[in-house]
């Protein structure tokens, strides 16, 4: 129950862990660094998968599956890639009771094993573009783990595409990062900034990385999705060439992009409260719980509750009834608040005689009467839409209230725990590294949204807050997960 959850103001990190476990979203595994995703948590992932998969297919992508094990020779073909991932890799050295002739890496990401296949499949410009997505698990050996946010094994999707021209590849990079932005904002009700990573923060082996960044309730940033322009790096490493329309042999241009179960952690930290989980209706596998107040003619009340649930379900709203008698209505109210059910309906004998029920919103706690007539399902649908929009609006207002410009390093240090900081940077990696070492803050992105850039005069020349060197523009700094 909610009384087992540490208040956010007391200990935000403990609040998060308490909530994840109390709401039965995930639990620790006996395997160090790994987690068990429980049914409540996996139901959220299934909703995310369904929405994203539809968006991928609407943009022309298809699903496939590639091996979990990657030969060491594949990994070594792209030097920057292996340098970036080597410390995180799990390596298989024995199989079938014998030492393997070649080590096998447990998939940290699939570029290398996928490009070994693409080399076989791509011969001509007619084979392009190749637009493939994979739903899979990956392993990156983590020393400090946190449920959903950072674990040694996690679930994700990874898109890998091949193109005939650099322009087509760049269009794909931007298309997919905008798909992620749309998903985050329209499904997760979580506003995000969109932009490019600095060279030191980009994906290992990429020419350029684009990302979306969200602000959590503790004012830290969370990277919620990435899209990488891989140039011709992997094509050259795997000698993947195609015959162009002009008859010449050319290397293909590549992208990759992905999101993971980390989004569940983001969803929790963006919206939830001290009573438990708060879910946007579009990602709630159970959107409405009906709690009958079993007094008087209990059977009539229970039957009405089930009839209402049937009506909602037939209208595409996922509803269920809890008419068990071993727990009180008050216990049920608290339990379903903990689980984040967006709407609770209360109905008793007097409500039936008045032809109404009481609807309670999980996000605000507000209650209202709903008429039990032919407008009932439409009223609940409108309420769910209002909750979805209200959650996004609230999160956006929170981010805007905690985003500020700073003009000096002293001010930067004082404000870095207060949200997103907009500040001048001289473009040098050594300056970026110094700021990170001294403040634990990183450049989250170079934002590309025109309205955001205009609001904060991002292109205005100035002086770097740290080095005092000339700066061509501003970037977004924050502490991050």
From Swiss-Prot:
Catalysed conversion reaction: tRNA(Pro) + L-proline + ATP = L-prolyl-tRNA(Pro) + AMP + diphosphate
A single GO cellular-component term on record: cytoplasm
EC number of the protein: 6.1.1.15
Database matches in SMART domains: ProRS-C_1 (SM00946)
Pfam family, one: ProRS-C_1
InterPro entries for the chain: aa-tRNA-synt_IIb (IPR002314), aa-tRNA-synth_II (IPR006195), aa-tRNA-synth_II/BPL/LPL (IPR045864), Anticodon-bd (IPR004154), Anticodon-bd_dom_sf (IPR036621), Pro-tRNA-ligase_IIa (IPR002316), Pro-tRNA-ligase_IIa_arc-type (IPR004499), Pro-tRNA_ligase_II_C (IPR016061)
GO terms assigned for molecular function: ATP binding; proline-tRNA ligase activity
UniProt keyword annotations, A-Z: Aminoacyl-tRNA synthetase, ATP-binding, Cytoplasm, Ligase, Nucleotide-binding, Protein biosynthesis
GO biological process terms on file: prolyl-tRNA aminoacylation
Domain of life: Bacteria
CDD domains with a match to the protein in the record: ProRS_anticodon_zinc, ProRS_core_arch_euk
Location within or outside the cell: Cytoplasm
Task of the protein: Catalyzes the attachment of proline to tRNA(Pro) in a two-step reaction: proline is first activated by ATP to form Pro-AMP and then transferred to the acceptor end of tRNA(Pro).
Domain notes: Consists of three domains: the N-terminal catalytic domain, the anticodon-binding domain and the C-terminal extension.
NCBIfam families, sorted: proS_fam_I
Protein family according to the UniProt entry: Belongs to the class-II aminoacyl-tRNA synthetase family. ProS type 3 subfamily.
Subunit annotation: Homodimer.
Entry protein name: Proline--tRNA ligase
Organism name: Chlorobium phaeobacteroides (strain BS1)
């Amino acid at each position: 129950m909610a009384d087992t959850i540490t208040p956010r103001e007391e200990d935000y990190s403990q609040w998060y862990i308490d909530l994840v476990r109390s709401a039965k979203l995930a639990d620790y595994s006996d395997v160090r660094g790994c987690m068990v995703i429980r049914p409540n948590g996996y139901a959220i992932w299934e909703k995310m998968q369904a929405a994203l998969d539809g968006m991928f297919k609407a943009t022309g992508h298809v699903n496939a599956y590639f091996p979990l094990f990657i030969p060491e020779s594949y990994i070594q073909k792209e030097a920057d890639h292996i340098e970036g991932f080597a410390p995180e890799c799990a390596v298989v050295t024995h199989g079938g009771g014998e030492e393997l002739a070649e080590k096998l890496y447990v998939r940290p990401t699939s570029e290398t094993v996928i490009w070994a296949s693409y080399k076989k499949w791509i011969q001509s410009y007619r084979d392009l573009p190749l637009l493939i997505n994979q739903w899979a698990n990956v392993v990156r050996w983590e020393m400090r783990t946190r449920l959903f946010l950072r674990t040694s094994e996690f679930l994700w999707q990874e898109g890998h595409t091949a193109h005939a021209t650099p322009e087509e590849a760049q269009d794909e990079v931007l298309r997919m990062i905008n798909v992620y932005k749309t998903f985050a904002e329209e499904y997760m009700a979580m506003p995000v900034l969109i932009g490019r990573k600095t060279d030191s923060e980009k994906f290992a082996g990429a020419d350029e990385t684009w990302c979306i960044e969200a602000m959590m309730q503790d004012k830290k940033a969370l990277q919620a999705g990435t899209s990488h322009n891989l140039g011709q790096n992997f094509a050259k490493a795997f000698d993947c060439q195609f015959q162009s329309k002009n008859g010449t042999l050319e290397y293909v241009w590549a992208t990759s992009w992905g999101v993971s179960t980390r989004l569940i952690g983001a969803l929790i930290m963006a919206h939830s409260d001290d009573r438990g989980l708060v879910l946007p209706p579009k990602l709630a596998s159970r959107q409405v719980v009906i709690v009958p107040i079993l007094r008087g003619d209990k059977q009539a009340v229970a039957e009405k509750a089930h009839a209402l649930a049937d009506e909602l379900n037939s209208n595409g709203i996922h509803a269920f009834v809890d008419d068990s008698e071993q727990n009180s209505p008050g216990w049920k109210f608290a339990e379903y608040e903990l689980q984040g059910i967006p709407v609770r309906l209360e109905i008793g004998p007097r409500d039936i005689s008045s032809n109404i029920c009481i609807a309670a919103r999980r996000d605000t706690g507000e209650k209202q009467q709903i008429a039990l007539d032919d407008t009932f399902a439409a009223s609940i649908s409108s309420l769910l839409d209002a909750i979805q929009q209200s959650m996004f609006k609230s999160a956006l207002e929170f981010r805007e209230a905690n985003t500020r410009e700073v003009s000096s390093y002293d001010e930067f240090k004082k404000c870095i725990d207060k949200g997103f900081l907009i500040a001048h940077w001289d473009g040098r990696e050594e300056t970026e590294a110094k700021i990170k070492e001294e403040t634990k803050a990183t450049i989250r992105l170079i934002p590309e949204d025109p309205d955001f850039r205009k609001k904060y005069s991002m292109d205005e020349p100035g002086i770097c807050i740290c080095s005092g060197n000339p700066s061509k523009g501003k970037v977004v700094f924050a502490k991050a997960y």
